[in-house]
From Swiss-Prot:
Pathway: Purine metabolism. It comes from Vibrio cholerae serotype O1 (strain M66-2). This is Nucleoside diphosphate kinase. ATP binds at K11, F59, R87, T93, R104, N114. It is found in: Cytoplasm. Major role in the synthesis of nucleoside triphosphates other than ATP. The ATP gamma phosphate is transferred to the NDP beta phosphate via a ping-pong mechanism, using a phosphorylated active-site intermediate. (Microbial infection) Catalyzes the phosphorylation of dZDP to dZTP, when the bacterium is infected by a phage that produces the substrate for the synthesis of dZTP (2- amino-2'-deoxyadenosine 5'-triphosphate), which is then used by the phage as a DNA polymerase substrate. The lineage of its organism: Bacteria, Pseudomonadati, Pseudomonadota, Gammaproteobacteria, Vibrionales. HAMAP family: NDP_kinase (MF_00451). Keywords: ATP-binding, Cytoplasm, Kinase, Magnesium, Metal-binding, Nucleotide metabolism, Nucleotide-binding, Phosphoprotein, Transferase. The gene is ndk. The active site is at H117. Homotetramer. GO terms for cellular component: cytoplasm. It is an enzyme of class 2 (transferase).
Length: 142
């Protein structure tokens, strides 16, 4: 099977609680490589652009408010079946339904403050990666 890329966010709630290192450790332990990463503080305009598909939905404004409330870590992950593998590691969106040992079961505070985001399809991964990273900032590892 070919290598696949996915996009990941460590959200403001997890950054604030100093969970970046623990989450990175678990990503790498799951067999995924971090091939690009940076810390950013989203502007309202950036958050609106990134979450444009949700505009008009009841959770859009609270989501933007949360995602602009503090710095986030954005990263590109690479590995076999990276999208499915990272989604399995994250667990269900609602931490109460997430399996034990998943990132959300272990670190999420609530459904809104659920610590991490991951792309749900190859098309989403490509769009989300391109939103934050020019190809020159992505460094595949052997």
């Amino acid at each position: 099977m070919a290598l696949e890329r996915t996009f990941s966010i460590i959200k403001p709630d997890a950054v604030k609680r100093n969970l970046i290192g623990e989450i990175y450790h678990r990503i790498e332990k799951a067999g995924l490589q971090i091939i690009a990463a940076k810390m950013v503080h989203l502007s309202e305009e950036q958050a609106s652009g990134f979450y444009a598909e949700h505009e008009g939905k009841p959770f859009f404004e609270p989501l933007k408010e949360f995602m602009t409330s503090g710095p986030i870590m954005v990263q590109v992950l690479e590995g076999e079946n990276a999208i499915a593998r990272y989604r399995e590691l994250m667990g269900k969106t609602n931490p109460e339904e997430a399996a034990c040992g998943t990132l959300r079961a272990d670190y999420a505070l609530s459904m809104r403050y659920n610590s991490v985001h991951g792309s749900d399809s190859p098309a989403s991964a490509a769009r989300e990666i391109e939103f934050f990273f020019p190809e020159s900032e992505i460094c595949p590892r052997p």
